[in-house]
């Protein structure tokens, strides 16, 4: 749309402008770096099982408010999914800066290395109990990880305060205690 007024979109805007492709077929990247033991890395998750690889680039048509959620719920009702968790190690701080998360790290300098397989079983992904638990109880914060996976860079330092304020406000508004699961069994069915 910005092209219609004679403006060429920058890398950030191009990254935000998404096709209406199925979410489960996408490869997700951390963008910001994390500590990876004694190394620095960016993390990604790529479709691995045939069923989610088949969704890569699959246009889902017109997207309404609940379209993507409904597609994910429908998928997991009968099927699981596998994703390859990968690390891209920093090999050159000049070409792979930690402080500027907008810089894409060149794969020719450091290809993504598989580090784990995420296996997600079939499930009722949006039951009323899970919706309340996910929306009202849980909080997301990249700083919840272990020290060996500490977030790095300026954007991550800003996020620590922003996420803390956001979760505090949300828990107060929802009148929910702030708890973090320590076991998969804490997540309702």
Language-model features, listed with the residues they occupy:
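Active-site-adjacent core segments of small-molecule enzymes
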Residues: 1-189
């Amino acid at each position: 749309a910005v092209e219609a007024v004679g403006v060429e979109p920058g890398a950030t805007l191009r990254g935000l402008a998404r096709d209406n492709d199925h979410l489960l077929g996408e490869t997700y990247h951390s963008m910001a770096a994390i500590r990876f033991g004694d190394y620095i890395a960016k993390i990604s998750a790529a479709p691995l099982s045939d069923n989610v690889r088949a969704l890569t680039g699959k246009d889902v048509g017109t997207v309404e408010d609940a379209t993507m959620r409904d597609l994910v719920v429908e998928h997991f009702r009968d099927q699981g999914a596998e994703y390859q968790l990968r690390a891209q190690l920093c090999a050159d701080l000049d070409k792979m800066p930690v402080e500027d998360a907008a810089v894409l790290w060149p794969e020719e300098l450091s290809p993504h290395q598989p580090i784990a397989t995420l296996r997600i079983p079939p499930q009722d992904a949006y039951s009323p109990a899970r919706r309340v638990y996910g929306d009202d109880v849980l909080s997301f914060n990249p700083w919840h990880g272990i020290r060996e996976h500490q977030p790095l860079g300026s954007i991550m330092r800003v996020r620590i305060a922003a996420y803390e304020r956001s979760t505090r406000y949300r828990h107060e508004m929802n009148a929910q205690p702030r708890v973090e699961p320590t076991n998969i069994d804490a997540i309702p069915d």
